[in-house]
Amino acid sequence: MLPTVFIVSDGTGITAETFAHSILSQFDQKFRLVRLPFVDSLEKAYATVEKINDAAVHDGRRAIVFTTLVDSESNDIVKRSNALVLDMFQRFVEPLEQELELKSSHAMGRGHQNADTEEYKTRIEAINFSLAHDDGQSNRNLSEADVILVGVSRSGKTPTSLYLAMQYGVKAANYPLIPEDFERGKLPSALTPHRDKLFGLSIDPQRLSEIRNERRPGSKYAAPENCRYEINEAEAMMRREGIKWLSSTHKSIEEIATTILQEIRLDRQSY
């Protein structure tokens, strides 16, 4: 039976869940995740304890609980449950208060209550920009891009662009490299004025073939030999044009995005 893990928060639970995933991924074990957001009253805290205790009885073992409850009374209630309770605020915020000699705001959901901030507006603008400039569908205002991802079709450009926009407020356009570009041996004309903003994504040809077969099975587009040709040509073009690039084959979107941010030296971070 899988161990049960509860994500308990007085807000959306995004912070607690992200932290939990980071910790749990260190173990070669599957878990059953139960999300309990908006636990923002004592009544809900008591109901949370009941659910945790029921899971412990059902599983025959203590549950694991990750919490970001800032209300101390609610937190104390949850800590009385039959579980290993990992309290992010107690473990991290309180030591920081002592070190900084400064009291934290203890504002519920503060990290995500940014709907009226400039940071939020920046991210929304970046998302709209990335959607408008996905897969080369528009060349307008490309000069406003922070980065322009290039690579063959299905190499990971779109999800990476959107992640950069949503997480970091980066205006990320993406543009496909197609067989016609390889025949000419040149970058698409729309990209040449923005060479300093280009970053390339490549991928293992066999993996590319598998991905394309899910979309268009049995087609030339997905054939292994065609994928090898496109990847070889794309990488040769990027080397020739002096474009920095990486292989997305064994990297998560988070890893790809972090590498891109380091390479383009764009120190933009969302909190």
Swiss-Prot record:
Keywords: Kinase, Nucleotide-binding, Serine/threonine-protein kinase, Transferase. It catalyses: [pyruvate, water dikinase] + ADP = [pyruvate, water dikinase]-phosphate + AMP + H(+); [pyruvate, water dikinase]-phosphate + phosphate + H(+) = [pyruvate, water dikinase] + diphosphate. The keyword Transferase applies. GO terms for molecular function: ADP binding; ATP binding; phosphotransferase activity, phosphate group as acceptor; protein serine/threonine kinase activity. Its EC number is 2.7.11.33, 2.7.4.28. It holds the Pfam family Kinase-PPPase. It comes from the Bacteria. ADP binds at G151, V152, S153, R154, S155, G156, K157, T158. Transmembrane segments: none annotated. Bifunctional serine/threonine kinase and phosphorylase involved in the regulation of the phosphoenolpyruvate synthase (PEPS) by catalyzing its phosphorylation/dephosphorylation. Belongs to the pyruvate, phosphate/water dikinase regulatory protein family. PSRP subfamily. NCBIfam families: PRK05339.1. This is Putative phosphoenolpyruvate synthase regulatory protein.
